[in-house]
């Protein structure tokens, strides 16, 4: 098999160098298929001369059958740890247990005792804070025992008796961060794992919240830029840019983000609790009488000045929908895709997202909803704010989700697709996880029904841990990460059946797979990609990073579609 982080050695070492040189030497005027064919021929001759052809260290683009993949789709959900979704999945590296009983018990300062993992039948969860400081608290220098303590802190923040609080603010009982789900609540996710590939060591790329994870997903880095010049960018993962997070060791730096306006946070939580969308504040037509009455009650929380701003400007007056992302001047993956004539699209479902812009360490309990859509740069859709996307006139490649359904139906999917949800189907607390599962199932069913299924790879993952317990210490690859472990699945007609991939992986592995499939191994490397930026490492080349090619058998007969019900019945219970 293909080992994690395998590097060319001995006679194969020059092959990797030759691959890079040949890749950049082939004129771009040739179509991509021709360039890859030339590259394969050159490397094939070199391998023959060295008598190492067919070794496991061969460049990925020489793997037999790789040409069968024409479409890579990344579906990104939100805020779940691996143990919270697959902690009791048979054969996976799940919650530690012995003789049918969990062996972990995390300190709980509320009771001066400890809390054990438990099956949580609730479809609506609270989670906990999930910023950089919270990751440090949860990891706690590798002890992985700070999750309950971190969640308990939230009980004293952003909670008000004037509206029904989310579960995270309830005054009694253990926080639900120790709860786990199984096939009883998420049967389709478990069915996909049973029939395709489950990655049980997929780590979020950075020990922080949603925005840095989504930036890594499309660019292999998270930074703060002073202007449009790549040289102005400095490392940034959700704490002060001048600080070095080193979160995988649990170091804290004394920086606590501004807690924001609690009255405003309480107002937005109040209207959300009554099922009112931000845009309906100014235009309440269609709302039930009880909802219109609730808006008036919620407005009473605010000061007169705040009330007027909300009535005048809607969600923007509350600090939520007026999200302004920074300028992202470093190089993202679409720059390489565009340079190699590889089509791409970033599909965004219109609606709202719950994460805060100025206050990333809050949960949904303390955030104003943030509007998102194809024309609105957002935390879950950052590409419109990248300067190279604008310079290449590629902003139109960020599309509404309806465009994805049409493309999948008619066989016109681009080579690379990313898909971002809206709040209600994202799995991000307090979203109903059955709603999220139905949304994901519908996406996958649509792909499977379409003409592109036999040439497609689907990667399904969750962007960060959301404050939920996980027992595996994240590997350290640089000062930013990795972050905590998240669920991940590989679905394809060429995916191995029922395979659990134990390799260390991160979202960098998705970029690496895209680069190997479509770009002949070109990397987001400031020394070779033609657009230098100050990033200090090439994440795709991390020694510990595994290889997603291990999840496939390109020689097998393409597997037929496996259409699942959007609203499945509960599956069987699992055991520790």
Task: Identify the function of each model-found stretch.
Residues 1-14, 21:
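Compositionally biased, low-complexity flexible segments
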Residues 55-275, 281-576:
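N-terminal pro-sequences and low-complexity stem/linker regions of secreted or lumenal proteins
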